[in-house]
């Protein structure tokens, strides 16, 4: 449908990222959106009519009257005609297109308030499955199978630029930028409009192998990708500049793509979101959660906390596995060594190995204690635990006072503090067990990390930032 519309210079608005795996009936049943939802709405806004088979085998045809050719909630009252036909009344028409033969068994009109299809600040109201008795739409297939639909097509304005906004500050502070940008472009300055706006969080950026456009040399905490369209290039350019200025106010940097090729490159990362499953080499559980845009920051912040808790717990699981590995290595003794030093007796080698294992055990013990302390006191200010952390090898006493009054959670979120296997354990193990002689020891310890890491749970978010629909994904 999207390709046929494009060939005629038109746009099919309900074009989700999962288009390759989607069908038209599914789009209606889910009230699907996509990146163009911010401009033209979801399926319900773009449907003229649809046909479906109910559980009794009867045909239903739902036809919207007096369509406003815009978003449904902008119309005070919305009317639908609902016609019921028998199972055998749908026949092949003269043009080969199915059509109904004879009068419907039953017809009725359904009149609904346009506002009931939306909740304030939301793209759709998923709590209202009944929708006043309107069949098919947003029912997820529960009241029948949708077989066909007639859609409104749109004309895309001729001028378009894609903006990519990278945010490096706290995620909760960055997310309100979505509201800023949408509020600005909802005014249609000089006719410029937002034709698509999508969000990727840090977990997704890692999964898709995102190449940061900024020169900062760090992965952003959040990326927004949006299309700005309009009738004149000048209006679109000015709107893009203002959007970047709004991003700058929230620790963001902006980049603009003008040519079709560069715009496609900007959107390529968004299209690869299924790569999140790479983290576990498996599949992902998807949950769509609809959040009011003005509360998206709270949701993002809470998800970040879950990820930090899960990450630390996974590393504590790792310390237990490493302790067992060190015990196993001690039991094996010099037999684990790859080769012996000439002139060094087996007794001397055993003593050297025991000393190294003892030091490794002490490092592991202190690291585990540090991580456990942080996990148990995320909401406490740094200053409360700085003395104990210093005893465990993490000296925060010299931090500026304004840093020490922050919560441990805040410092972990912005990476002022890190819980790092590589820096705190792996590098220390490599120092203690250097060279070819100890390569089997290092291999054993690093294999522990790989095994335990695969059991880590984390949550990744990407959002249709224009309609509040947050895809919350847990790779399994």
Predicted regions and their residues:
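C-terminal substrate-recognition/cap domain of FAD-linked oxidoreductases
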Residues: 139, 145-476
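FAD-binding subdomain of flavoenzyme oxidoreductases
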Residues: 1-179
């Amino acid at each position: 449908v999207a390709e046929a519309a494009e060939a005629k210079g038109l746009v099919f608005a309900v074009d989700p990222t999962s288009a390759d795996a989607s069908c038209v009936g599914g789009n209606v049943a889910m009230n699907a959106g996509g990146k163009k939802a911010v401009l033209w709405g979801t399926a319900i806004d773009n449907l003229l009519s649809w046909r479906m088979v109910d559980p009794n085998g009867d045909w239903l045809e739902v036809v919207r009257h007096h369509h406003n050719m815009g978003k449904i909630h902008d119309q005070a009252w919305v009317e639908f005609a609902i016609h019921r036909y028998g199972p055998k009344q749908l026949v092949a028409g003269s043009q080969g297109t199915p059509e109904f033969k004879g009068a419907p068994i039953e017809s009725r009109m359904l009149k609904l308030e346009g506002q009931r299809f939306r909740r304030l600040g939301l793209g759709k109201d998923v709590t209202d499955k009944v929708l006043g008795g309107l069949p098919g739409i947003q029912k997820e297939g529960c009241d029948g199978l949708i077989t066909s639909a007639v859609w409104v097509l749109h004309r895309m304005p001729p001028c378009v630029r894609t903006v990519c906004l990278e945010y490096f500050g706290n995620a909760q502070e960055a997310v309100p930028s979505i509201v800023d940008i949408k509020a600005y472009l909802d005014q249609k300055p000089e006719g410029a409009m937002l034709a698509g706006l999508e969000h990727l969080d840090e977990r997704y950026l890692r999964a898709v192998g995102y190449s940061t456009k900024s020169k900062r040399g760090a992965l952003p905490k959040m990326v927004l990708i949006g299309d700005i369209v309009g009738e004149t290039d000048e209006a679109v350019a000015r709107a893009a500049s203002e959007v970047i200025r709004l991003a700058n106010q929230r620790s963001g940097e902006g980049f603009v793509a003008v040519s079709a090729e560069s715009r496609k490159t900007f959107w390529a990362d968004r299209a690869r979101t299924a790569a999140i499953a790479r983290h576990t080499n498996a599949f992902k559980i998807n949950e769509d959660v609809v959040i009011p845009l003005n509360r998206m920051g709270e949701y993002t912040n809470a998800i970040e906390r879950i990820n930090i808790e899960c990450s630390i717990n996974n590393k504590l699981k790792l310390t237990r596995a490493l302790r067992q590995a060190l015990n196993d290595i001690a039991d094996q003794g010099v037999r684990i060594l790859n080769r012996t030093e000439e002139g060094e007796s087996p007794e001397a080698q055993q003593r050297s190995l025991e000393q190294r294992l003892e030091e490794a055990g002490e490092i592991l013990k202190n690291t585990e204690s540090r991580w456990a302390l942080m996990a148990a006191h995320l909401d406490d200010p740094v200053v409360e635990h700085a003395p104990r952390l210093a005893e465990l090898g993490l000296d925060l006493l010299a931090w500026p006072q304004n840093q020490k009054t922050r919560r441990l959670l805040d410092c972990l979120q912005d990476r002022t503090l890190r819980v790092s296997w590589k820096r705190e354990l792996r590098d220390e193990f490599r120092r203690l067990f250097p060279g070819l002689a100890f390569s089997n020891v290092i291999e054993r310890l690093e294999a522990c990390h790989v095994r335990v890491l695969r059991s880590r749970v984390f949550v990744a978010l990407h959002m249709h930032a224009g309609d509040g629909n947050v895809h919350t994904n847990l790779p399994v």
